[in-house]
From Swiss-Prot:
Pathway: Membrane lipid metabolism; glycerophospholipid metabolism. It comes from Nocardia farcinica (strain IFM 10152). It is found in: Cytoplasm. InterPro entries: 6-PGluconate_DH-like_C_sf (IPR008927), 6PGD_dom2 (IPR013328), G3P_DH_NAD-dep (IPR006168), G3P_DH_NAD-dep_C (IPR006109), G3P_DH_NAD-dep_N (IPR011128), NAD(P)-bd_dom_sf (IPR036291). NADPH binds at S11, W12, R32, R33, K110, A144, R259, V284, E286. This is Glycerol-3-phosphate dehydrogenase [NAD(P)+]. Its main location: cytoplasm. It catalyses: sn-glycerol 3-phosphate + NAD(+) = dihydroxyacetone phosphate + NADH + H(+); sn-glycerol 3-phosphate + NADP(+) = dihydroxyacetone phosphate + NADPH + H(+). The gene is gpsA.
């Protein structure tokens, strides 16, 4: 039996821990807050996230070193912009898992690190010293609440080492969760990071009262700019046509369960950034920070991303949503 440590007890970390346990994997969850670890261990539920979901038998702890002891699969389930700081604190125990148990590090985080413009797999490699072949990423249309409820879903596990991707696939395959494998780590990560930004745009449009034509146009043109950036960075175009691209984008842009869409909806309806934060119950809307780093990454590679730029201007430069829409519609017309 595979032994997994899930580091992070937010919505997605909790839901994925349930997936692993349902697949027959031995799971220990690390929670930052001691009271959450206690509830997970004794009540098999997370009172802060997904409180109505009953988890199978999992262990839980507030001690990351204890969670990592003997782990063959390490699931990194913390927000993208705090990943580096967490990895730095966990580094000795992570190195022990790698050196003693040949552990695979699996990132659930979706984002581009602010400042360095690194993808999450690159941050993991830089901080832990893990070889590229040991690092995998998971991306797809994976809304945590639906998966925790056992609703059918699919995802992509990408790793340059196909055998490791297959091992993670086996450890997370259940009757309701179907993982596919891929070796295109770049494509999966760029798709996962950028879709949050486009979801903000779709939420803004919905909040403004715009209709399905507008939303469909944003999703389609959003995919076009995501694909431009991903291919420039070395991704395979077909990856963006799959679960880690179109699949993730559609789910995040259209579902009321999407934090990024919900955040954008408040802005589109005339609410402030503070009101939008309250609407997501204090949980991270990754696209708010990602739009800055994705925009900078695109600029560094001379890739045009007008939707990302518009979202950044609304979230960080104070322009109104109507100004943003006007600037997009006023762009020079061109072939598709």
């Amino acid at each position: 039996m595979t032994r997994a440590a899930v580091l992070g007890a937010g919505s997605w970390g909790t839901a994925f821990a349930k997936v692993l346990a349902d697949a027959g994997t031995e799971v220990t969850i690390w929670a930052r807050r001691p009271e959450i670890a206690e509830a997970l261990a004794t009540e098999h539920r997370n009172p802060a996230y997904l409180p109505d979901v009953q988890l199978p038998a999992v262990s839980a702890t507030h001690d990351a070193e204890a969670a990592l002891d003997g782990a063959q699969l390490v699931v990194l389930a913390v927000p993208s912009q705090s990943l580096r700081a967490n990895l730095t604190g966990w580094r000795p125990a992570l190195r022990a898992a790698i050196d003693e148990h040949d552990a695979t590090l699996l990132s659930l985080a979706k984002g581009i690190e602010t400042g360095t413009l690194l993808r999450m797999s690159q941050v993991i490699a830089e901080v832990t010293g893990a070889e590229e072949r040991r690092i995998a990423v998971l991306s797809g249309p994976n809304l945590a609440r639906e998966i925790a409820a056992g609703q059918p879903a699919a995802t992509v596990i990408a790793c340059s080492d196909a055998a490791r991707a297959e091992a993670v696939q086996q450890a997370s395959y259940t009757g309701y969760f179907r993982p596919y494998t891929n070796t295109d780590v770049i494509g999966c990560e760029i798709g996962g990071a950028c879709k949050n930004v486009i979801a903000l745009a779709c939420g803004i449009a919905a909040g403004m009262g715009l209709g399905d034509n507008s939303i469909a146009s944003l999703i389609t043109r959003g995919l076009a700019e995501i694909m431009r950036l991903a291919v420039t960075l070395g991704a395979e175009p077909v990856t963006l046509a799959g679960l880690a691209g179109v699949g993730d984008l559609v789910a995040t842009c259209t579902s009321p369960l999407s934090r990024n869409r919900s955040f954008g909806h408040v802005l589109g309806a005339g609410g402030s950034m503070e009101a939008a934060q309250q609407a997501t119950h204090g949980q991270v809307a990754e696209g708010v920070k990602s739009c800055t780093s994705v925009r900078a990454l695109a600029a560094a590679h001379e890739v045009e991303m007008p939707l990302t730029d518009a979202v950044h201007r609304v979230c960080h430069e104070g322009i109104s949503v109507r100004e943003a829409v006007g600037s997009l519609l006023g762009r020079r017309i061109k072939p598709e």
